[in-house]
Swiss-Prot record:
This is Phospho-N-acetylmuramoyl-pentapeptide-transferase. It is found in: Cell inner membrane. The chain crosses the membrane at residues 22-42, 74-94, 95-115, 134-154, 168-188, 201-221, 240-260, 267-287, 292-312, 342-362. GO terms for cellular component: plasma membrane. It comes from Francisella tularensis subsp. mediasiatica (strain FSC147). Pathway: Cell wall biogenesis; peptidoglycan biosynthesis. Its EC number is 2.7.8.13. Its cofactor is Mg(2+). Signal peptide: none annotated. GO terms for biological process: cell division; cell wall organization; peptidoglycan biosynthetic process; regulation of cell shape. Keywords: Cell cycle, Cell division, Cell inner membrane, Cell membrane, Cell shape, Cell wall biogenesis/degradation, Magnesium, Membrane, Metal-binding, Peptidoglycan synthesis, Transferase, Transmembrane, Transmembrane helix. It is a multi-pass membrane protein. GO terms for molecular function: metal ion binding; phospho-N-acetylmuramoyl-pentapeptide-transferase activity; UDP-N-acetylmuramoyl-L-alanyl-D-glutamyl-meso-2,6-diaminopimelyl-D-alanyl-D-alanine:undecaprenyl-phosphate transferase activity.
Amino acid sequence: MLIYLFEWLSHYFKGLEVFSSYISVRIIMISITSLLITLALGRPMISWLQKMQIGQIVRDDGPQSHFSKRNTPTMGGVLILSSVIISCLLWGDLTSIYLWILILVVIFFGAIGFFDDYLKLVLKHPKGLRAKHKFALQSIFSIVLAIVLFYLLSKNGQMSLSIPFSKSLYIPMGIVIFVVLAFFIINGSSNAVNLTDGLDGLAIVPVVLVAAGLGIYAYIETNSTLANYLLFNYLGNPGLAEVAVFCAAVCGSGLAFLWFNSHPAEVFMGDVGSLTLGAVLGVIAVMVRQELIFFIMGLLFVVEALSVMLQVGSYKLRNGKRIFRMAPIHHHFELKGWPETKVVIRFWIISLILFLIGLAAIKVR
């Protein structure tokens, strides 16, 4: 909305056109806006969650250090998602179909996560939304979205899988391969981030780093000068540049949420936050044709999800024998005696290294 206001005001006041004409300026402004909104609303929301007694449920078989987290306010992901949507409505180009798709993803997956949290925390349903129902909803939406994205992106012929660290190697993709790949990326990312969100601040920093990385790729690939200079395929789809703006909103809101989510956490994001942020990252990766870069930058999420799959598989196939002391893998390290803060910071360091490797692929090609 604001870009239209500044566009009109620029006819009367010189210099204001930078707020409507330059996407780099809007990236800065939306990140600041989402950060400030989250910081401003964080404390009132935490107080409201405490008043409504919407607190974290802690497993009895988990690390003993987690017992102190019991009843810590959760569903704080609503704060992140609201901030992102408001900021996008203020600073985004509302003619961009890609921006609206991302907002729709936030709303849909946010609704799934919210309903799951509501069942568990408010209605005291022990398992929340059944896994098969959750997966069915995610799957139907992901498949429909993948088909829509295929036809939108194929208008400019952007249907090749980009290979990192190569300037000329691209793998052509038809609709079947594209939809299958997008399905696994979106659903896998959504659930992997959800599994990672088990310690204070553990998930939000990798989410911010991956969002920042994908935002940088989106900015480069939708800028013809930068794309040609860095030997990327130019993504000239109208409105696709708004993906970078959206990523900036996620980064700003995520950093502000860390203010409240850092150890000892005052609030957790809950499924409403983690499921949605994971899905959003997957959709962005598909939009900017950087699925493999997303795999590199988000490898921490992949490892967390794989640890659960291996643990469950081992338990079923090896007569109750486990690979890890507890899954996801961050709990394994806790039970080995690592303090929670050490686990979190070391995982952040790993995520930062993966982020830098992903960025290196911009130039090392």
